[in-house]
């Protein structure tokens, strides 16, 4: 019997493989992206302290868009996380796409964060 491939399980395996190589430091923390069917989340994490420094998502009060699962929403989250990071003095990050393909909402978030001033 042929079993159907569980895309999320494959993504988690890919993310584990990527996380072995990507590590966020205090000088250059990790920008982690999580994408669900309805929302998108971004965190800037210092892996040496195991602490989230800055976060933004489509659930935030400052978000202000009606639709939360499209490219425009991802761009807004990218701008929010970059603005908050720059307020904390973070300019350079390591991008962690979370095992997702660099396409669509993930790419839109990354491009918006770059345009807002983050370097990666």
UniProtKB/Swiss-Prot annotation:
This is one of the proteins that bind and probably mediate the attachment of the 5S RNA into the large ribosomal subunit, where it forms part of the central protuberance. Keywords: Phosphoprotein, Ribonucleoprotein, Ribosomal protein, RNA-binding, rRNA-binding. Pfam families: Ribosomal_L18p. PANTHER family: 39S RIBOSOMAL PROTEIN L18, MITOCHONDRIAL, LARGE RIBOSOMAL SUBUNIT PROTEIN UL18M. The protein, when overexpressed in E.coli, contains a phosphoserine, which is required for the protein to bind to 5S rRNA. It has been suggested, based solely on amino acid conservation, that this occurs on Ser-57. Gene3D superfamilies: 3.30.420.100. GO terms for biological process: translation. GO terms for cellular component: cytosolic large ribosomal subunit. InterPro entries: Ribosomal_uL18_bac-type, Ribosomal_uL18_bac/euk. GO terms for molecular function: 5S rRNA binding; structural constituent of ribosome. Part of the 50S ribosomal subunit; part of the 5S rRNA/L5/L18 subcomplex. In B.stearothermophilus only 2 proteins, L5 and L18 have been shown to be part of this subcomplex, unlike the case in E.coli and T.thermophilus where L25 (TL5) is also found. This is Large ribosomal subunit protein uL18. It comes from Geobacillus stearothermophilus. HAMAP family: Ribosomal_uL18_B. The keyword Ribosomal protein applies. Transmembrane segments: none annotated. Belongs to the universal ribosomal protein uL18 family. The keyword Chaperone does not apply.
């Amino acid at each position: 019997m042929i079993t159907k491939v569980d895309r999320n399980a494959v993504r988690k395996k890919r993310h584990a493989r990527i996380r072995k190589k990507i590590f966020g430091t205090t000088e250059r923390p990790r920008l982690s992206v999580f994408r669900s069917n309805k929302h998108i989340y971004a965190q800037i994490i210092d892996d040496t302290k195991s602490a989230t420094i800055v976060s933004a998502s489509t659930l935030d009060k400052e978000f202000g868009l009606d639709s939360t699962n499209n490219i425009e929403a991802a761009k807004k989250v990218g701008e929010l996380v970059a603005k908050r990071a720059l307020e904390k003095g973070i300019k350079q990050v390591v991008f962690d796409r979370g095992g997702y393909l660099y396409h669509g909402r993930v790419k839109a978030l990354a491009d918006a964060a770059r345009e807002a001033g983050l370097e990666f």
